[in-house]
Amino acid sequence: STGLPTRTQQGDLLSTAFLSHGDTAHPVLLPGSVEECFTFGHQAFDLAERLQAPLFVLSDLDLGMNQWMAEPFEYPDRPMDRGKVLDGEALARLGGFARYRDVDGDGICWRTLPGTDHPRAAYFTRGTGHDEAAAYSERADVYERNLARLARKLEGARTLLPGLVVAGEGAEVGVI
């Protein structure tokens, strides 16, 4: 789209943040400069892996249509943060593996990656109604526990995301 559809609106933010079936939300990064576009772009990959969730970076007409001066960007000199990943050796040490068990209490569960060489590495998840072992369930208590876990994960995500920028202290008018 061009013109009015490219201007950021509250509806864009709400649609992106709550883009899903059911009661869930997703982190959204809103860059305010070309430097932040670059930085948030590569941070989004790490955060999406760590949180095991879609993470969105929204740009708008102002950033996309104007010419900006910027210092050369520095690429990260660290490996990608894959988050809580169990390999075959870790699975062998565990008594059992439940894909959606919140071991650490932060809402982010340990996971395996495709190709992990261990018989307990694979799992199948059907929909949002599942128990800790990824088995399908429509039981209210199971769904309530899952929603509570997702709420803990989203709350913890706030500490991982870039902080808000507040400028113009003492101003009579604020723009959000």
Region spans (language model):
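Active-site/ligand-binding-proximal alpha/beta "capping" segment
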Residues: 23-46
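A short, small-residue-rich loop immediately preceding and capping a beta-strand
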Residues: 1, 30, 176
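Glycine-rich, flexible loop/turn motifs
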Residues: 9-12, 25, 157-162
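Flexible, low-complexity linker and terminal segments
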Residues: 40, 45-176
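Flexible glycine/proline-rich, aromatic-decorated loop/lid segments
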Residues: 1-23, 76, 80
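Acidic, glycine-rich active-site loops and adjacent beta-strand->loop/helix elements
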Residues: 1, 33-35, 61-64
